[in-house]
Amino acid sequence: MDILFEKVYTLVTITPQGCGRKRKVEVQEMGLNLSGMTTETRNPRTMQLDQMSPLEIVTVMNEEDARVPLAIAKCLPQIAQAVTWAAEAFEKGGRLFYMGAGTSGRLGVLDAAECPPTFGVPKEMVVGLIAGGEKAFIEAVEGAEDSRELAVEDLKAHSLTANDLVVGIAASGRTPYVLGGLDYAKSVGCHTAAIACNIGSAIGKAAELAIEVNCGPEVLTGSTRLKSGTAQKLILNMISTGSMVRTGKAYQNLMVDVQQTNEKLHTRAENIVIDATGVEREKARAAIDAAGGSVKTAITMLLADCDAKEAARRLERAHGHVREAIRLEVL
């Protein structure tokens, strides 16, 4: 990969207090040959896209989207390894970091943001980092994705440790921000994984684990927010959900650590207890109240026939796994 020249950009990071912190960052602009990348090649099925009717457009898009799960199926062993590493990180008090730019970064932030309400975990447990910071979630930040230095700064700001897992995400597989983050993570001693939509990608080679999905050319040439973005989202779903399930955040297929932040979720919590135990709604509601709002504790109380205090002790001994807590002897 030949480097043509360097530029210095001034990036402004907006703090929670609304203050701006300026940073001059050197970025490398690459002379790239993108024509060999699957994500940049033209799709022969859509060469006449501009001549298609609305029904023809959505039909071909739907047919192309159907290829994504089949492509992901070829990467399941690698995705399962990422799930294992994430679960191990959580059990050691570590965290899961997603790193990406543009659409890839936004998808990481989106998946991370869903973990606290779904699994009742602190927002610091799964962190989405996007090149350029929060502003980049809604608009492009010039030069951000081309800076390895920014990635290192972002990870240092979160005090990265060897107990964490860093997952780099880039459809092209060559984003400098992601490469910089993976290299720094390896120097810290983290497990590292890469999600790309080109085989033999730079980030795949840089990471300890490569998850490379060949979804074929995009319907709209080079628009990786389409099939590539869909593939990335499905893989992130698997990593976050699988690792949370492995660490006791589900009983059967129920979200037993769901946070009750609105009326719909209060009702869902009651339904989860009913589904898990078979009790009537009034009894489920009473158990949740006695458990201080904890669905997991309420289920353990009802299935182990114990009070909230004992249920909490059982869950602590079982490291949060309801099934194991129910089987424990009376404390």
What kind of region is each of these model predictions?
Residues 3, 7-13, 17, 33:
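Short, positively charged and aromatic/hydrophobic N-terminal segments
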Residues 27-71, 75:
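Cofactor-/ligand-binding subdomain signature composed of acidic, glycine-rich
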Residues 60-68, 128-139, 251, 292:
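Gly-rich Lys/Arg/Thr-decorated short loops/hinges at beta-loop-alpha junctions or inter-strand turns
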Residues 74-89:
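A short, well-structured juxtamembrane/interface segment
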Residues 94:
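Glycine-centered, small-residue-biased loops immediately flanking beta-strands
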Residues 97-235, 241-247:
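Glycine-rich phosphate-binding loops that contact phosphosugars or nucleotide phosphates
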